[in-house]
């Protein structure tokens, strides 16, 4: 596991963009070094190239990036295990409002309803029915 600098914010998209480069470096390193040596190199890279180091470590550990857990050290020296922001967002408990999925579902339903009953046609139909009832009441049809 890695100890990333406290000042660095880990963004999954940035790390994913570096995976091809990390894979190339890993292929070169794995031909000459074992897993522990590669971990040592990754730890030394953390200060300069944090995102690349995380990508390389996830490849070395054979884990998907979004599951790769990172230890975070606070200024007081407390070590906590945190996942990247996207994973935390996905796993977070919904406290208020509607979930994104529910919002999307409602939007899809609204779109279907709009297509099925366009406002102009619905209004015209109401007026037509009202006129027919009025004509019937007056005995014209």
From Swiss-Prot:
Compositional bias ranges of the Basic residues kind: 100-112, 124-141
Residue stretches in coiled coil: none
One Gene Ontology CC term in the entry: virion component
Compositional bias segments (type: Basic and acidic residues): 80-91
InterPro entries, per the entry: Phage_T4_Gp68 (IPR016415)
Site (Cleavage): 16-17
Region (Disordered): 80-141
Domain of life: Viruses
Keyword Membrane: no
Sorted UniProt keywords: Virion
Record function comment: Plays a role in the phage head size determination. About ten copies of gp68* are found in the mature phage head.
Protein name, UniProt field: Prohead assembly protein gp68
């Amino acid at each position: 596991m890695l100890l990333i600098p406290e000042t660095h914010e880990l963004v999954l998209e940035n790390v994913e963009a570096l995976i091809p480069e990390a894979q190339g470096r890993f292929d070169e390193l794995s031909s000459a070094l074992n897993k522990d040596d590669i971990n040592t190199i990754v730890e030394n890279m953390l200060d300069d190239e944090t995102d690349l180091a995380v990508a390389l470590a996830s490849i070395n550990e054979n884990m998907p990036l979004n599951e790769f857990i990172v230890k975070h050290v606070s200024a007081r020296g407390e070590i906590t295990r945190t996942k990247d922001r996207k994973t935390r967002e996905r796993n977070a408990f919904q406290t208020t409002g509607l979930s994104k999925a529910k919002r999307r579902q409602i939007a899809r339903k609204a779109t279907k309803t709009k297509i099925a009953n366009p406002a102009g046609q619905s209004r015209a139909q109401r007026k037509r029915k009202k006129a027919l009832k009025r004509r019937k009441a007056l005995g014209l049809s």
